[in-house]
Amino acid sequence: MANMVVTGEQLDKSIREVVRILEDAVGCTAGPKGLTVAISKPYGAPEVTKDGYKVMKSIKPEDPLALAIANIIAQSASQCNDKVGDGTTTCSILTAKVIEEVSKVKAAGADIICVREGVLKAKEAVLEALKCMKREVLSEEEIAQVATISANGDKNIGTKIAQCVKEVGKDGVITVEESKGFKELDVEKTDGMQFDRGYLSPYFVTNSEKMLVEFENPYILLTEKKLNIIQPLLPILENIARSGRPLLIIAEDVEGEALSTLVLNKLRGGLHVAAVKAPGFGDRRKDMLGDIAILTGAKHVINDELAIKMEDLTLCDLGTAKNIRITKDTTTIIGSVDNSCAHVQSRICQIRMQIDNSTSDYDKEKLQERLAKLSGGVAVLKVGGSSEVEVKERKDRVEDALHATRAAVEEGVVPGGGAALLYTLSALDNLKSKNDDEQLGINIVKRALQAPIKRIIKNAGSENAPCVIAHLLKQNDKELIFNVDVMNFANAFTSGVIDPLKVVRIAFDFAVSLAAVFMTLNAIVVDIPSKDDNSAAGGAGMGGMGGMGGF
């Protein structure tokens, strides 16, 4: 496929137009009084959402140049979303403002390299100022406030998320699922460990109506080995049968003679038994089996390295639990060893050290999951509603609120509603520049810092943003904010208008870094659509770019 190179004023104009259109679509969702956006689907009804990231990634211009620019911006938004799961809307508003201001000084003939240095210098000063403004999140009420703000003012969502954090702890797992019921939001708590492995045979089911395996006071046998033959298991199975208690086997796999014999004994009523595959793979499986052993009190995880063999196991070597619930997809161990016992706490400390020492985001995520299973259990937020559109829109807000809450617990909070960024202006007043063009870059960031609060106030139906900003800066009180819910000034922390520092920090960082990339972007190479393609863009000179008709 042939391609072409787009440079100069044509490229700059295209960047400005794409950024403006993206900001219009995404920016309208900002704040508690932000609007929704409908996203059409190839099949089914359009999806209605206030999730800025979802809106951003759904925009695919027909024009190849516009698409290339939009993809660069969407990639940065994706990285922002991956880091904190929120802040995409703020990132979009800031990016658009910086690029708009840069285009003005570029047209005036400023040295763009010096301007870029000024922008990046201002960025570092703002990030430091934000850190000095933070306050730790300690109470359940503060957690609820953060979640409520991120859920666009939905207090029910904020309260439920705070309830989840209280129940499973700051390291606990909280997940979001769609519910088939009409109840808007409900919390389901799992006390214990849950992993994504179900029963190996439906013949193990004890509750045929719900297709569940349900055991009370079972023994738990753990092994890293694959079980093919029944002979090594016979001694411990005989002891289990005499005890009258059920048995759960967690192994790499159970198949062949071993599986068929277990199923046969279960069907004949001689043994209450079930088998599941061990969670994870490779070394991670070994670690997770070790976690289960600690949590259930099992003395051994049978493997080739141990001196003790399967045939030598006694009932005292096995783990135990109050209850076990197994579906075709998950296994939940409930009421095992007390999470506060010394062995469990020692394991938790060990995993925390591994998280601190890990350099891989993927490894950290998996270690965090292990930590959560050991320390806090699992809480599930079940989102319901009267229609699929309603459920999906609410689920988006719940997920955003959950991400924001985690960020707030991790790094603390700052005044919300765009006020935190506004108050960092003072950090730029005394910032020294090498020359006039570098000062232009600093001034660009100053104007960009006012963009989020202006947009939030605009979305609330007011054009009074300049007066609001002037009043906030005049008071010299960095806890003062403008609450658009009541259209009046208030204290950020007493009114609950707060944002997670991590979300604000990363959104600003990514926005300015992305804008800096566009500052020095001199050319884009794009493919020319084939003649059979109905694309709006032609091959010669990108005709039709004016007004971005390709959107």
UniProtKB/Swiss-Prot annotation:
As its record notes, the protein acts as a catalyst of: ATP + H2O + a folded polypeptide = ADP + phosphate + an unfolded polypeptide
Looking up Pfam families in the UniProt record yields:
Cpn60_TCP1
InterPro entries per UniProt: Chaperonin_Cpn60_CS, Cpn60/GroEL, Cpn60/GroEL/TCP-1, GroEL-like_apical_dom_sf, GROEL-like_equatorial_sf, TCP-1-like_intermed_sf
Residues the record lists as binding ATP: T29, A30, G31, P32, K50, D86, G87, T88, T89, T90, G417, D499
| A GO term from the CC aspect | cytoplasm
Localization per record: Cytoplasm
Q: What does this protein do?
A: Together with its co-chaperonin GroES, plays an essential role in assisting protein folding. The GroEL-GroES system forms a nano-cage that allows encapsulation of the non-native substrate proteins and provides a physical environment optimized to promote and accelerate protein folding.
Quaternary assembly: Forms a cylinder of 14 subunits composed of two heptameric rings stacked back-to-back. Interacts with the co-chaperonin GroES.
- Annotated family: Belongs to the chaperonin (HSP60) family.
Protein name stated in the entry = Chaperonin GroEL
Native source organism of the sequence? Ehrlichia ruminantium (strain Welgevonden)
